[in-house]
Amino acid sequence: MYTRYSYKPSLGRTYVYDNKYYKNLGAVIKNAKRKKHEIEHEVEERTLDPLDKYLVAEDPFLGPGKNQKLTLFKEIRNVKPDTMKLVVNWSGKEFLRETWTRFMEDSFPIVNDQEIMDVFLVINMRPTRPNRCYRFLAQHALRCDPDYVPHEVIRIVEPSYVGSNNEYRISLAKRGGGCPVMNLHSEYTNSFEEFINRVIWENFYKPIVYVGTDSAEEEEILLEVSLVFKVKEFAPDAPLYTGPAY
């Protein structure tokens, strides 16, 4: 005999739902967003298809053009462990001293009809002591306030390891301007200091650079600091020589 409190099998029924008709709400939203992203990506790729016929250099330093090197100075600096030393400071007397140690390549004097497309500051670092095993570190800043006075020594905080050939290379080109620069020969011949101030720093950034090592001891480093000018190479309008062989 059943009462109102007794359990009746017919009162409660069990239903089995087929999962193929139900999907996770998160999966539905993610799938919709994924399809939308793929459609937008295809549209963007179609707009960039005309650029496939152009080639660009992954590293601008290795791109088209000729590199003209001007070595500014070679010096030996001592760097203590866990610190980085200021080696390039254009805002002070660093490059306005009377004793210039410039070493020019024979090909440097840039003629008037050549265009300068970019300028790189290149710092080559070499250990002076034999059988030393450490790596070089470097840090730089480009957009400094003209009145900013950098510290001579700083602690190592998130530095960059110097790559192959122990060479640290910085592009000094300003975004949206500064290139090309022409007619450098007369300025350079008249006064090198005026050439640096009026031509280079009017069109390119003034960097400050710190270098260091990951060594646990004080190290002696030979630094070679140079400016490398990327010169645009173009074919002349007329052949240089005329004769039977041409």
UniProtKB/Swiss-Prot annotation:
A GO molecular-function annotation: structural molecule activity
Keyword S-adenosyl-L-methionine belongs to the record: no
Highest taxon in the source lineage: Viruses
Keywords from the UniProt entry: Viral occlusion body
One Gene Ontology cellular component annotation held by this UniProt entry: viral occlusion body
Record Pfam families: Polyhedrin (PF00738)
Claim: Transferase is one of the keywords in the record: no
Family: Belongs to the polyhedrin family.
Functional note: Major component of the virus occlusion bodies, which are large proteinaceous structures (polyhedra), that protect the virus from the outside environment for extended periods until they are ingested by insect larvae.
Name of the protein this chain belongs to: Polyhedrin
Organism: Buzura suppressaria nuclear polyhedrosis virus (BsNPV)
